[in-house]
Amino acid sequence: MKQISADNFKKVLNINTIGPALVGKFFLPLLDNKNPSVFGFLSARVGSISDNKLGGWHAYRASKASLNMLIKNFAIELARTNKLAKVIGLHPGTVDTDLSKPFQKNVPDNKLFTPQFSADAMINVVRGLKDGDSGSVFAFDGSKIES
């Protein structure tokens, strides 16, 4: 809690919540309503309130929880005009990037993914979506992440 700062909180919310909200605002209405389509937002498991067992990462967790609510809202609103579109969140897993470097030592060997593995896994999730999945957040392995 000591590390919370207003400036950092605003920065993280701008990147992880407000940016995606504006992307959704302008692009979701453009989805074809005559053919099935999927709009996926990059979310994270740490945005799940019920899955939070460790605390910490206050701004990041709050920004992703907020994004997950937007995903649900967008799915509900889009379904009123486009029954064939799905709006989902995708958790890529822990990907070997600069962002994950500080905590990679705590990640099990088989749970640190290459960007290519993660991208392929998320594409497979999209391919396996079913009716009723819009508004949900899915992990790279296809499991649904609870709110």
What are these regions (language model features)?
Residues 19-24, 122:
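Conserved internal alpha-helix within the Rossmann fold of NAD(P)-dependent oxidoreductases
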Residues 45-47, 93-97:
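Short connector loops/turns at beta-strand edges and beta->alpha or beta->beta junctions
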Residues 89, 97, 101-147:
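C-terminal helical subdomain
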Residues 68, 78-95, 133-137:
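Conserved Rossmann-fold SDR core element
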Residues 24, 71, 119:
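Short-chain dehydrogenase/reductase
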Residues 1-18, 28, 32-81:
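Catalytic loop of short-chain dehydrogenase/reductase
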